[in-house]
């Protein structure tokens, strides 16, 4: 029996930062299926276009009424009557025919907006799962050609200390995450993570005062930390005090594009200070040396965006130096774009993809980016954005794609915990057919 799309309606809702975003209700003969898209703060210049209205009299220019209009008036009429199980066909139709905009890196979604296309793409996945009488994670696994019997629960990468563009402190690196690789299950990994988080909170309160325990966009803390060493010392002490030494490791997201000077080709580790300390302006090679030093001193297992999104040379240097032991993740470098991934493979620039569905703008293309990375023995980390909604789609996606790792904030703030709570449910429903990635998180490739 065909399960056709009978109605599509888009609306403007608010994300976790109070900015507008797109939500879609897609109706089939089986009911209404809803999806909402997230939005990033530190965005890569090569991401597919997130369409904003730029009408300064409304939401400071961040409204998404044009994207809503594009869905309701351009996309919806073309999709009514199509079978909701035709995911690839519908995604390709929206991206290539209805939008059709391109750059040298592929389909850019600059006509209709990646936020418009993705909201429908996600809702269609939910409708397709219902039509196939299966869960969303199993349906997504089928779309990706993955094993649907034995499935992998991811290691959570919990962002607990914030810096960079996410925080008002002096810290240049954007995220410091705890990664409970030594836990026996996802449920226990979250317990380890939550206990370290609360231990860290009390340590920060003692050292920096109660104001420093206010949380940022992703639920992490932003105490007045000056540099990476101070942040890492604080994490190591908190992990030890919570009783999880050797079981909880550390990951960093540097977001180095945010403090790169394109003219001088240098990195300013004091970029948030008006009269910056010139000794903290580093060359690419000096930054390579700093990462090598940090990895020797601290239990760091993953570094994301260590250099600018166009600094292929230093990415390759770092990957060659420490890539065997440390995951080097491309986010702004790759923007979940298969063409950028091909270039990174050719240049041996990194060894892992950060998968953000809204960077590329359709589920079909996101799956393609993941499969290309896994085929080349890269790790893949599924990720949220700093502006999130209560939508839990990425929790199902990470299990479906068997990537073994997810980052979706601290164990705090409901839009972050919504994803982790969905993973608790999935782990429970899988029972003996689900296994936790643990310290093999880089190897979930089948």
From Swiss-Prot:
Binds 2 Mg(2+) ions per subunit. Mg(2+) is required for catalysis and for stabilizing the dimer. Unlike for mammalian and yeast enolases, Mg(2+) is dispensable to form an active closed conformation. Inhibited by high levels of Mg(2+). Signal peptide: none annotated. The active site is at residues 218, 356. It catalyses: (2R)-2-phosphoglycerate = phosphoenolpyruvate + H2O. The modification Phosphothreonine is found at residue 339. The gene is ENO. Keywords: Acetylation, Cell membrane, Cytoplasm, Cytoskeleton, Glycolysis, Isopeptide bond, Lyase, Magnesium, Membrane, Metal-binding, Nucleus, Phosphoprotein, Ubl conjugation, Vacuole. One of its GO terms (cellular component) is cell surface. The modification Phosphoserine is found at residue 42. This is Enolase. The pentapeptide insert motif is required for the stabilization of the apo-enzyme in an active closed conformation, independently of Mg(2+) binding. The motif is also required for homodimerization. This motif is only present in Apicomplexa and plant enolases. The DKSLVK motif binds to the lysine-binding Kringle domains of plasminogen from various mammalian species. This motif is present only in enolases of plant and several microbial pathogens including Plasmodium species. It is found in: Cytoplasm; Nucleus; Cytoplasm, Cytoskeleton; Cell surface. Substrate binds at residues 166, 175, 304, 331, 383-386, 407. Homodimer. Forms a complex at least composed of DegP, ENO and HSP70. Interacts with G-actin. Interacts (via the DKSLVK motif) with mammalian host PLG/plasminogen (present in the mosquito blood meal); the interaction occurs at the ookinete cell surface and is required for ookinete invasion of the mosquito midgut. Interacts with A.gambiae EBP; depending on the Plasmodium species, the interaction is either involved in ookinete invasion of the mosquito midgut (P.berghei) or is dispensable (P.falciparum). InterPro entries: Enolase, Enolase-like_C_sf, Enolase-like_N, Enolase_C, Enolase_CS, Enolase_N. Pathway: Carbohydrate degradation; glycolysis; pyruvate from D-glyceraldehyde 3-phosphate: step 4/5. NCBIfam families: eno (TIGR01060). The modification Phosphotyrosine is found at residue 139.
């Amino acid at each position: 029996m065909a399960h056709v799309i009978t109605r599509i309606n888009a609306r403007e809702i608010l994300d976790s930062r109070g900015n507008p975003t797109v939500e879609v209700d897609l109706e089939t003969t089986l009911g209404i299926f809803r999806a909402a898209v997230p939005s990033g703060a530190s965005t890569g210049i090569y991401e597919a276009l997130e369409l904003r209205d730029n009408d300064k009299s409304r939401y400071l220019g961040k409204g998404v009424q044009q994207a809503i209009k594009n869905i309701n008036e351009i996309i919806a009429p073309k999709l009514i009557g199509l079978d909701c199980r035709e995911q690839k066909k519908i995604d390709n139709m929206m991206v290539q025919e209805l939008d059709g905009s391109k750059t040298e890196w592929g389909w850019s979604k600059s006509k209709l907006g990646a936020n418009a296309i993705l909201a429908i793409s996600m809702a269609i996945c939910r409708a397709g799962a219902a039509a196939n009488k299966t869960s969303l994670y199993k349906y997504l696994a089928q779309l990706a050609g993955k094993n649907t019997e034995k499935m992998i629960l991811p290691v959570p990468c919990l962002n607990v200390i914030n810096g960079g563009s996410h925080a008002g402190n002096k810290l240049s690196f954007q995220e410091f995450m705890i990664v409970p690789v030594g836990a026996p299950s996802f449920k226990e990994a979250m317990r380890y993570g939550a206990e370290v988080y609360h231990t860290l909170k009390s340590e920060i309160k003692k050292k920096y005062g109660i104001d420093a325990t206010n949380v940022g966009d992703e639920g992490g803390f932003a105490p007045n930390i000056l540099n990476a060493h101070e942040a890492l010392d604080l994490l190591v002490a908190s992990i030890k005090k919570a009783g999880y030494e050797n079981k909880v490791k550390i990951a960093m997201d540097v977001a180095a594009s945010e403090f790169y000077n394109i003219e001088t080709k240098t990195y300013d580790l004091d970029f948030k200070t008006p009269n910056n300390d010139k000794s903290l302006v580093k060359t690419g090679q000096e930054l390579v040396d700093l990462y090598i030093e940090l990895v020797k001193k601290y239990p760091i297992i993953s570094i994301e965006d260590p250099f600018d999104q166009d600094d292929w040379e230093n990415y390759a240097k770092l990957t060659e130096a420490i890539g065997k032991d440390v995951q080097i993740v491309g986010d702004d470098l790759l923007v979940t774009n298969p063409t950028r991934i091909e270039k990174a493979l050719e240049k041996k620039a990194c060894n892992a993809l950060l998968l953000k569905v809204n960077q590329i703008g359709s589920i079909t293309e996101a799956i393609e980016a993941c499969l290309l990375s896994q085929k080349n023995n890269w790790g893949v980390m599924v990720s949220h954005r700093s502006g999130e909604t209560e939508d839990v789609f990425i929790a199902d996606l990470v299990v479906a794609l068997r990537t073994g790792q997810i980052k979706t904030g601290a164990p705090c703030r409901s839009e972050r915990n919504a994803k982790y709570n969905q993973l608790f449910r999935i782990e429970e429903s899988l029972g003996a057919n689900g296994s936790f990635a643990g310290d093999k998180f880089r190897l979930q490739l089948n």
